[in-house]
């Protein structure tokens, strides 16, 4: 009898204890993807209040190669991280003087896609993939609010890939590509919401060991063993050459509201870029006879290309919105130069150019009709006119752009190839439509 009474008492006590620990979900703070939000600078600049949340779907989870993530709009040399170029027609919506052609720029963090977070709790996202062809990819993001108005975010992209042919030793894991991309971003808003600051540091360090393709078949024994699928036995044309691209870019955007409403806001953008481009062939004296290099009378044993680029770009302007209309007007001064570290012929003086421009947008409350225009004029002869319109998912757009050729296209000097040309500016007109 005492045993039954004790058991009943124990059951009643535990039931009360367990029921006391149940918390009503309606009163408990739950953190997750819904409490993590971010904005893009282009939306803020164009007077759009648009909030995004991290995507938890697995639609593109299996896409590892950057080329696949771009919907195969780029083409590389067949291996992860190798030099890539755009394969279609793409109009650059810019009129400043380009500095260089970047074969590895695709693998850097793109300024227009950098996310400025606001998190209620620390947010971390990590993705690691190791492939059967000796490649590895790591993506790591950590974002955390220091307080309710200040956030700091770290984003890292790291990958490496091994050679598929042209091995110089017995190992089948010789490195072909070594890549680091890092950006640190922060954003701050004052108590009254009048002042907003967005800033980031963007770094790229990308190295590719150059192979120059497979050696000509006239040097190979065309036996059944040679032409078998064991392509790892093929030899590369180059064995001691590599390219490297190195970026250090700093960016600041800040704005201050002159009125409580969105009618008048001052903004300022500042970009400082420092890029280094390397190409080194330590066996150039032997390799210059290959098909990789053009005919040259150089007697150098080593080929070294080392060029630095610097640029300082600013925009000062006024923006706002009123009854469905949004506008901004700005003046954009820019300084840039190139320094030839190994060949002074590649060095240019500091060059200065100035642009003035503006945007005017309109959208109905339900976004049934959206109109956008952008005009920009430069002292370098550059001109940009863009018009876009969307009505119930039917769209039309027009672009007219005149832009100078890049410093790289205008002139370049090296041991094995040189040119100096007086190209005209590129002129583009584009008309496009879109429909469901």
PLM feature segments, named:
Residues 20-222, 257-261, 390-392:
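Membrane-proximal, glycine/serine-rich, low-complexity loop/turn segments characteristic
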Residues 1-26, 195, 264:
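Bacterial Sec-dependent N-terminal signal peptides
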Residues 70, 161-246, 381-385, 392-436:
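Outer-membrane beta-barrel translocator/channel fold
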Residues 102-107, 130-134, 176, 230-233, ...:
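A short linear-motif detector with a strong N-terminal bias
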Residues 20-79, 220-299, 384-386, 398, ...:
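N-terminal start-of-domain structural block
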Residues 119-121, 244-283, 298-436:
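Exposed, low-structure sequence patches enriched in small/polar residues
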Residues 17, 151, 326:
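Exposed beta-strand and adjacent loop surfaces of beta-rich binding modules
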């Amino acid at each position: 009898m005492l045993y039954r009474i004790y058991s009943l008492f124990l059951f009643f006590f535990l039931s009360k204890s367990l029921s006391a620990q149940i918390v009503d979900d309606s009163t408990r703070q739950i953190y997750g993807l819904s409490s993590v939000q971010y904005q893009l600078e282009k939306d803020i600049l164009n007077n759009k209040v648009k909030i995004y949340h991290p995507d938890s779907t697995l639609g593109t989870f299996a896409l590892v190669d950057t080329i696949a993530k771009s919907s195969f709009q780029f083409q590389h040399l067949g291996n992860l991280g190798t030099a890539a170029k755009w394969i279609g027609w793409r109009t650059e919506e810019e009129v400043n003087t380009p500095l260089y052609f970047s074969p590895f720029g695709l693998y850097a963090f793109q300024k227009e896609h950098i996310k400025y977070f606001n998190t209620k709790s620390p947010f971390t996202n990590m993705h690691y993939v190791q492939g059967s062809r000796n490649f590895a990819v790591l993506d790591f993001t950590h974002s955390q609010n220091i307080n309710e108005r200040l956030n700091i975010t770290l984003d890292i992209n790291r990958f490496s890939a091994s050679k598929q042919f042209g091995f110089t030793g017995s190992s089948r894991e010789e490195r072909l590509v070594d890549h680091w991309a890092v950006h640190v971003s922060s954003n701050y808003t004052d108590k009254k919401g009048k002042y907003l600051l967005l800033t980031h540091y963007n770094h790229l360090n990308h190295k590719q060991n150059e192979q120059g393709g497979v050696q000509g078949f006239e040097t190979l024994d065309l036996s059944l063993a040679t032409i078998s699928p064991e392509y790892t036995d093929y030899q590369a044309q180059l064995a001691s050459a590599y390219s490297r691209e190195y970026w250090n870019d700093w960016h600041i955007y800040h704005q201050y509201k002159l009125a409580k409403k969105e009618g008048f806001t001052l903004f300022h953008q500042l970009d400082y870029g420092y890029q280094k481009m390397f190409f080194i062939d330590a066996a150039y004296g032997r390799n210059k006879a290959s098909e990789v290099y053009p005919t040259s009378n150089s007697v150098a044993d080593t080929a070294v290309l080392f060029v630095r680029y610097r640029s300082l770009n600013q925009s000062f302007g006024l923006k706002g919105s009123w009854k469905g209309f949004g506008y901004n007007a700005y003046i954009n001064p820019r300084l840039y130069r190139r320094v030839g570290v190994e060949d002074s012929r590649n060095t240019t003086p500091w060059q200065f150019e100035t642009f003035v421009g503006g945007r005017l947008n309109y959208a109905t409350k339900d976004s049934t009709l959206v109109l956008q225009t952008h005009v920009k004029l430069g002292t370098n002869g550059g001109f940009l006119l863009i018009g876009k319109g969307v009505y119930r998912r039917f769209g039309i757009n027009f672009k007219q752009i005149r832009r100078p050729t890049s410093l790289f296209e205008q002139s370049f000097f090296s041991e094995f190839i040189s040119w100096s040309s007086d190209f005209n500016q590129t002129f583009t007109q584009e008309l496009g439509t879109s429909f469901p």
